């Protein structure tokens, strides 16, 4: 491809609204252009990369035995109402009404549609297992679209769905898809980790996320330094570092704590170690109209996913209002605690092992200091309520936990019979009786993969593509292309390289574009290999080669350049 026949849309300046590196570089490299908040046009440079990701995803899905289909992007509300997700999904679901007053949504995912297809097309266990996938645009009405393609309102996704007569068959396909995902991200050249995950609004039982490791990632992912244990922070089990509860050494005392509403104020104002404080968070209980208190250590954070999954707690999690607190307890937030609390409470495992700690007195501007379990109050229900922190013991008993940032690019789920039961998706089993189909679903954020790869592979000059993902493998840059010798040598090399199957971008911009600008553009775009053709080099029988990952160029004999490049480019 010649730049004179291509939309080369590089920009020197970084747009002011682009925060993360991938967003900045995709705009500057002419890969995408913003249409509206969370909506982007893919330009030719970016689309070449996107199509390469799609091709690898498609190859590995086909190799894993999945069948490609294509479902409508617009879905009738009836299917979502049937599954129960029309109300559950919330405002992120883009809803619309047609001219006949029928409700629809723009699909963020396709569990309902594929289940409807399966119940109409499958009737016997002999047709199982079956795994179907599509690569399609999805829609989500993000409240704050940000970070370019990382969190947009429209995105390209590969979603696959499998159907099975039993859980054992589902597990086989789930493991096969886990391997396929590992193959995909390995082929894409990404540093990634699969981690245990929560199923969220998709529902079902087991699931794994695949994260590209990057400091700009939105997710905290947790690893053991002594084993292969890995989970996202929502899922990771928090094991207390303490093994036993220390003996009490302080007397219980009621202390005036005026204008002390936060843990930080309590610690600073009274010289308390933060690990000797607790937070009392009151939420709506599962029983309608009731409240329940969740208690964690002052230096820990509530894990809302874990909390919402407790049978005593309403799901989704709803914090009690100030009015509800006053009505139920007689005190406001900042003065609450488990001692003399007129509500049921659940404490975190770490709180159970505390001694001589401080709690709100359930009286405004007062706290109890020197509180101890069993002496001052009984130990209530204990559960895992908090996020893990670095240094916690690994849940598998091997090593301690580290926390890194990750970008979620894939997620696989074992849905079980959640959708088949709700939507009556059945086949006749071996015994001739109806069987609800066990189901798996498997997603990859195809467009997000492009951004994640840039987050992981860039420098101060621009993107650093590997040979697999690069929009072009070779940048061919002639200096003084208007001269006969340079033009002739460049055109011959271009023809030879393209005939050999290489993807080449020939920068044939005229002399108004300086060599420095040409070099800077090719570095910005991230093309892995650059060949420069010049009068001086040709006079010496050489061309200049430079790898995107190396700082210094090297001279290559004109006669050897094709074999040299064949040894350099990973195809």
From Swiss-Prot:
GO BP annotations, alphabetical order: prolyl-tRNA aminoacylation
Keyword Transcription regulation: no
Catalysis performed (reactions): tRNA(Pro) + L-proline + ATP = L-prolyl-tRNA(Pro) + AMP + diphosphate
PROSITE patterns xref list: AA_TRNA_LIGASE_II
Record's subcellular location: Cytoplasm
Gene Ontology CC annotations of this record: cytosol
Domain of life, source organism: Bacteria
Keyword Membrane: no
Classification via Pfam families: HGTP_anticodon, tRNA-synt_2b, tRNA_edit
Listed GO MF terms: aminoacyl-tRNA deacylase activity; ATP binding; proline-tRNA ligase activity
Function: Catalyzes the attachment of proline to tRNA(Pro) in a two-step reaction: proline is first activated by ATP to form Pro-AMP and then transferred to the acceptor end of tRNA(Pro). As ProRS can inadvertently accommodate and process non-cognate amino acids such as alanine and cysteine, to avoid such errors it has two additional distinct editing activities against alanine. One activity is designated as 'pretransfer' editing and involves the tRNA(Pro)-independent hydrolysis of activated Ala-AMP.
Self-association and partners: Homodimer.
Protein name: Proline--tRNA ligase
Species whose genome carries this gene: Pseudomonas syringae pv. syringae (strain B728a)
Protein's gene: proS
């Amino acid at each position: 491809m010649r730049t004179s026949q291509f939309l080369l849309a590089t920009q020197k300046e970084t747009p002011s609204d682009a925060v993360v590196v991938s967003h900045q570089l995709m705009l500057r490299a002419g890969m995408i252009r913003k249409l509206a908040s969370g909506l982007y046009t893919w330009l030719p440079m970016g689309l070449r990369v996107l199509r390469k990701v799609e091709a690898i995803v498609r190859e590995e899905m086909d190799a894993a035995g999945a069948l490609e289909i294509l479902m409508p992007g617009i879905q009738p509300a009836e299917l979502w109402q049937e599954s129960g997700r029309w109300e559950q999904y919330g405002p992120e679901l883009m809803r619309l009404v047609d001219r006949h007053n029928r409700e629809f949504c723009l699909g963020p995912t396709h569990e309902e549609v594929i289940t409807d297809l399966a119940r109409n097309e499958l009737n016997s266990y002999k047709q199982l297992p079956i795994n179907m996938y599509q690569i399609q645009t999805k829609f989500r009405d993000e409240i704050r679209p940000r970070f370019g393609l990382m969190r947009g309102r429209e995105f390209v996704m590969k979603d696959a769905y499998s159907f099975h007569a039993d859980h054992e068959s589902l597990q086989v396909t789930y493991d096969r898809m886990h391997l396929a995902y590992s193959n995909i991200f390995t082929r894409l050249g990404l540093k990634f980790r699969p981690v245990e995950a929560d199923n969220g609004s998709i529902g079902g039982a087991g699931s794994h996320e695949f994260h590209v490791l990057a400091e700009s990632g939105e997710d905290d992912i947790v690893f053991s330094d002594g084993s292969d244990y890995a989970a996202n922070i929502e899922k990771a089990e928090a094991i207390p570092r303490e093994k036993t509860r220390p003996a009490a050494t302080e007397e219980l005392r009621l202390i005036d704590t005026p204008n002390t509403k936060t843990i930080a104020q309590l610690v600073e104002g009274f010289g308390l170690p933060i690990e000797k404080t607790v937070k009392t968070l009151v939420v709506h209980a599962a029983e309608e109209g009731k409240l329940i208190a969740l208690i964690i250590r002052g230096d820990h954070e509530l894990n809302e996913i874990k909390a919402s999954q407790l049978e005593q707690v309403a799901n989704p999690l709803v914090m009690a209002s100030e009015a509800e607190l006053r009505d139920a307890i007689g005190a406001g937030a900042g003065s609450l605690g488990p001692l003399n609390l007129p509500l049921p409470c659940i404490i975190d495992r770490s709180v159970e092992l505390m001694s001589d700690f401080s709690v709100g007195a359930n009286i405004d501007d007062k706290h109890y200091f020197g509180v101890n379990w069993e002496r001052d109050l009984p130990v209530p229900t204990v559960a895992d309520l908090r996020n893990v922190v670095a240094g916690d013991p690994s849940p598998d008993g091997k090593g301690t936990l580290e926390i890194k940032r990750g970008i979620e690019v894939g997620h696989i789920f074992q849905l079980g019979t959640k959708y088949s039961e709700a939507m009556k998706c059945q086949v006749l089993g071996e015994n001739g009786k109806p069987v609800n189909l066990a189901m798996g679903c498997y997603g990859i954020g195809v467009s997000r993969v492009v951004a994640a790869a840039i987050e992981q592979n860039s420098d101060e000059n621009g993107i650093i593509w590997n040979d697999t993902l690069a929009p072009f493998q070779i940048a061919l840059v002639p200096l003084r292309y208007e001269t006969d010798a340079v033009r002739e040598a460049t055109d011959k090399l271009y023809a030879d390289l393209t005939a050999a199957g290489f993807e080449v971008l020939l920068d044939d911009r005229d002399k108004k574009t300086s060599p420095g600008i040409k070099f800077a553009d090719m570095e910005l775009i991230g093309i892995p290999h650059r060949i420069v053709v010049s009068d001086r080099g040709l006079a010496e029988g050489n061309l200049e080669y430079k790898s995107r990952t190396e700082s210094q160029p090297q001279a290559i004999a004109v006669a050897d350049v094709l074999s040299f490049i064949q040894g350099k480019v990973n195809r």
